[in-house]
Design a protein with these regions (language model features):
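Bacterial Sec-dependent N-terminal signal peptides
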Residues: 1-36
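Terminal presequence/propeptide segments associated with secretion/organelle targeting
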Residues: 29-728
Length: 728
């Protein structure tokens, strides 16, 4: 892609929107067992309902999902589009994970009001804190629109033409929903590798306020050390409230808004659970690749995962060093570090689990069975004889460039924040209404509040070195030629000059830059000019593998469909795609390896053990007042039958990223806790379900209520809840 063409096409806002949305993606990851699967609530078949009842489900299916009357799905929300949550009061209280609300807590924190360290409690509605960029989403209904979507395609279309036709129809169907009712959002998603399409109709609420957050010593206890691990003792929860207008309709933030009154409130149980108790999760899992070919898995391991491991490890080390030195930096960088390190450790664990559990061998065995079935089935042999060899060849063709793009995305698009600022500016729609332009600018200006130039410069130098060391010279963008010819190969000198001459390194400079310049002169800023150079290289690499990628998309779709035809008698569930899903199973212990037996719950006793074992480690530092409260043993009605305070528990529910904050219900639809993590031994779970070792980690609702009432002294929140206590 020619640089001049990029600059000349700057005024085509539609084109730039399409181009940069792809780049900016980098800124922002058959039921063979009764407990496997992320099921669509609106499409539960008889086999699934039967399996749930056999395991202990007591409530009828129409109480799980109904479009005619309030049901359990009406209490479950998508929280911000990246997590899940559950509505627990008539006045719109929402429980979600502490790590889901972490960014909001951080934005309200300062050195003087360190809510990350000390926690936050709103003792009145007036003290609840607004979060302008946060929303919750309720699912109203789902509808199969496969036939309508596929009518837009013809057999003679290329893969690119087919994709464009399908995307256009999906948008059209979704837009029809909001045109009929402006309070609704319609989204069509692809299922089963693009073989089916379903419409989901939602209602969004944009006024969501922070009500309660425990200190990070509770909500993040164990931090990176314990992340993805069991046994766990993390009180990973916080509380928000949904607000609406006086007619109970969605509304942007206003002091005149009132608490939202939901269709359905999830009841809470204090009865707890036992080994083998039924448990189901409801939430919004992000994405899985259960039907991906072995070739795709191998590419993921060596490309995206390895790039994330290598590059983020370097970047995070710089961040963490500075965060440990200064409280102001700790607060500024807390949220971005938390998000980055979460997926970094996930990638490490995923690659390790794929190897240890021999996932590739299992996939190849399934593919061998498919090959034989195709050869023995005349109707399939005619169409798919060369399917597997085509997959292998096309993945091989794009191997090196795909790997380079993974490192490119991590090193530059998701690396120095100055690059992110430049790309955001290039994506501004300057022809929009003034109100929208101002909103775009304000959103960018807000990012500077959590930005440190000195740290970002060090990150940039490290990213330049890391990328050069990991890819072939053919994949180096033009900036490396500049570094070598004008700066003698010295990355530090290049970065110093770049930041010294760019005006967008500070909010004041950005305002001055945008007020003075027109789009004609924007490329005069070296950071913006660099952004264009990176886009050119990005699309150059993308074009190199375009043909192979189109072929892979088609082959993977046909591979998915062929597997379902081969096992037509099996009950298949679709991969996760950020739509509401149900998973179910039982609470239970597990043995990950010889000599290790893990119980199905933990208690506060383990908190004291870890504090002692990890003395001096900030990941396990807990305030004396918290330890004193836990040591008192005054757990009241929140204690189990032995008088212990349970903290976390595990089930074999099938979850993934996005399920964080998902409600964990018993067979009566009563809240047991919130899902917040998976376990280390089954980090390959996005690719294959491992029934013997895969576990969903949840925080016990009784521990949550204990912390709210006893530590937060927020009994007014407890009084709002619908608590079922059969022990009385």
């Amino acid at each position: 892609m020619n640089r001049n063409k990029v600059i000349n096409s700057f005024f085509s806002r539609k084109r730039w929107g399409e181009v940069l949305c792809l780049v900016l993606l980098f800124l922002y990851p058959a039921s063979l067992h009764a407990d496997e699967g992320m099921w669509m609530l609106g499409n539960l078949n008889k086999e699934t309902r039967k399996a749930m009842k056999e395991l202990g489900l007591q409530m009828p299916a129409d109480r799980l999902y109904s479009t005619k009357r309030p049901s359990l799905k009406d209490a479950v929300v998508s929280f911000g589009g990246f997590c899940s949550g559950v509505v627990v009061s008539e006045d719109g209280l929402v429980f979600t994970n502490h790590h889901c609300g972490f960014s909001s807590i951080q934005q309200h924190s300062s050195v003087d009001h360190d809510y990350l360290k000390d926690g936050f409690v709103a003792h009145s509605r007036e003290e609840e804190l607004p979060n302008p960029e946060l929303y919750v989403r309720f699912l109203l209904r789902t509808e199969d629109v496969t036939r309508r979507v596929l009518k837009a395609t013809t057999p003679g279309m290329t893969e690119a033409e087919r994709g464009l036709a399908i995307d256009s129809m999906m948008i059209l169907i979704g837009d029809e929903v909001s045109k009929k009712d402006s309070t609704l959002v319609g989204i069509v998603d692809a299922y089963y590798g693009g073989n089916e399409f379903w419409l989901s109709v939602y209602r969004d609420f944009n006024d969501v306020r922070l009500v309660f957050a425990p200190p990070s010593s509770i909500g993040k206890f164990g931090w990176d050390t314990d992340n993805w691990m069991w046994p766990r003792h993390t009180g990973d929860f916080c509380v928000f409230r949904i607000y609406a207008d006086k007619e109970n309709r969605p509304a942007d933030y206003s002091p005149d808004n009132v608490p939202y009154h939901p269709e359905y409130v999830a009841p809470i149980t204090l009865d707890g659970y036992k080994e083998g108790s039924f448990c189901m999760t409801l939430g919004y899992p992000g994405s899985t690749e259960r039907y991906l070919s072995s070739f795709g898995i191998e590419e993921m391991m060596n490309g995206m995962n390895q790039a994330m491991i290598d590059v983020r490890g370097v970047k995070q080390a710089i961040w963490k060093r500075e965060m440990d030195r200064r409280d102001s930096i700790r607060i500024k960088y807390a949220s971005k570090y938390d998000e980055s390190s979460n997926y970094w450790k996930n990638s490490i664990g995923t690659n390790k689990a794929i190897r240890k559990l021999k996932v590739l061998d299992k996939k190849r065995q399934a593919e061998d069975a498919l090959r034989k079935w195709i050869q023995k089935t005349p109707s399939e042999r005619e169409k798919l004889l060369h399917l597997m060899s085509s997959l292998e060849l096309n993945y091989k063709d794009r191997k090196e460039v795909n790997r380079a793009m993974a490192y490119f995305g991590e090193s530059f698009i998701n690396g120095p924040e100055l690059v992110q600022f430049a790309l955001t500016i290039l994506n501004f729609d300057f022809e929009a209404e003034q109100k929208q332009v101002v909103a775009q600018l304000q959103k960018l200006l807000d990012k500077y509040a959590n930005y440190d130039v000195t740290i970002d410069k060090e990150v940039f130098v490290a990213m330049l070195k890391e990328y050069r060391s990991k890819v072939d010279q053919a994949y180096l963008p033009d900036l490396y030629q500049t570094i070598d010819t004008l700066y003698g190969g010295n990355e530090q000198m290049y970065v110093d000059s770049l930041y010294a001459h760019s005006e967008i390194t500070s909010p004041r400079g950005l305002k001055r830059f945008l007020e003075r310049d027109t789009t004609f002169h924007m490329v005069d800023d070296p950071a913006v000019s660099l952004g264009i150079d990176l886009i050119v290289k990005f699309f150059d690499m993308r074009s190199q593998m375009a043909e192979a990628s189109d072929n892979i998309e088609k082959d993977e779709r046909e591979f998915n469909a062929a597997m379902r035809r081969m096992y037509a008698d099996r009950n298949f569930y679709p991969d996760a795609n950020s739509t509401m899903r149900l998973s179910f199973g039982t609470i239970g212990s597990y043995s990950p390896y010889d000599g290790a037996d893990y119980d199905y719950y933990t208690t506060v006793k383990g908190i004291f053990e870890k504090v002692k074992e990890h003395s001096g480690d900030p990941d396990f530092a807990v305030q004396p007042e918290v330890l004193s409260l836990l040591a008192s043993g005054d757990f009241g009605r929140y204690a189990d039958e032995k008088g212990d305070m349970n903290v976390c528990f595990i089930s074999n529910n099938d979850i993934t990223g996005g399920n964080s904050g998902s409600a964990m219900f018993n067979g009566n639809g009563e809240l047991l806790g919130l899902a917040f993590d998976g376990n280390w031994e089954a980090m390959s779970s996005d690719i294959v379900f491992e029934p013997e070792v895969q576990r969903c980690i949840g925080v016990d609702v009784r521990y949550m209520l204990f912390i709210i009432e006893k530590f937060g002294k927020a009994s007014q929140l407890i009084q709002e809840l619908k608590i079922e206590d059969r022990k009385k």
